[in-house]
Curated annotation (Swiss-Prot):
Name listed for the protein in its UniProt record: 3'-5' exoribonuclease YhaM
Protein's job: Shows a 3'-5' exoribonuclease activity.
Keywords per UniProt: DNA-binding, Exonuclease, Hydrolase, Nuclease
CDD domains linked to this entry: HDc, YhaM_OBF_like
InterPro entries documented for this protein: 3'-5'_exoribonuclease_YhaM (IPR020873), HD/PDEase_dom (IPR003607), HD_domain (IPR006674), NA-bd_OB-fold (IPR012340), NA-bd_OB_tRNA (IPR004365), YhaM_exoribonuc/phosphodiest (IPR050798)
GO biological process: rRNA 3'-end processing
EC number: 3.1.-.-
Natural source organism: Listeria monocytogenes serovar 1/2a (strain ATCC BAA-679 / EGD-e)
Amino acid sequence: MEKRLLDFEVGETVDLFLLIKSSVKGTASNGKPFLSLVLQDKSGELEAKLWDVKESDEANYGVQQIVHLMGDIQNYRGRKQLKIRQIRQATALDGVSASEFMETAPINKEEMADEITQYIFEMKNANLQRITRALLKKYQDDFYDYPAAMRHHHEFVSGLSFHVVSMLRLAKSVADLYPSVNRDLLYAGVILHDLGKVIELSGPVSTTYTLEGNLIGHISIVVEEVSKIADELSIDGEEVVVLKHVLLSHHGKGEWGSPKPPLVREAEILHQIDLMDASLNMMDKVLKHTKPGEFSERVFGLDNRSFYNPTFE
């Protein structure tokens, strides 16, 4: 099987076609310009620097360009980084397309849509079900295509819906264990908690923040969407207020982006399972490329920790 980008170890030489996920111009200490690139294939992404760039390089090596690259894997502050030796733009003769380099969810969109729909059908509270169903229908195309984040966790095509499916499974297990949990409120919170990402983020390819994402953020966006759809459906019960609280508080703390801490049971559960699924996704990503008996590279989204991969099963 052909090795992919993250399969290479420090010290090994890379000779691959890769997709440029991001390209940012900088100035080195010697005053010369360089490009800071994030390069990706289906295995994940690595940072690389292209030094002493010319004006033409900025156009040739911009976002969404496919390049053929030779270089070396290095260790930079506990993380793998790619040192570029040779780089060129891919041409039509190379026969490669962007879709070949984009990581996607391990479950296809149709299966995820069927599973999420089943959870909505199980909801008994008519108001919560109608709001959830209407918002999902409004944004369903983007919901099943978008990543869950720009970086850190589920940052791949269909990552948003995969994150939701994983959380719904966790939510069901929690509700089975604790009968006092309001399943309808919890399921609605899980399905809608990151729906604002379809407005906050630019899309599944070379994802950036939109103007709304930079100025408002996905939490405020989804709460506004709930208010609008509730008005359209003439729903004004307590469910609307409590659902908005569950969504507002799902980051848990003010310093993490939530204006209110969780103050109802389902809000606390949503926060915890969101954190769990995101954390495990980040761990799985680095441990997949860590040999047994060794520590992973540092994970910025998890307090810059390195994780150990045990030798036993």
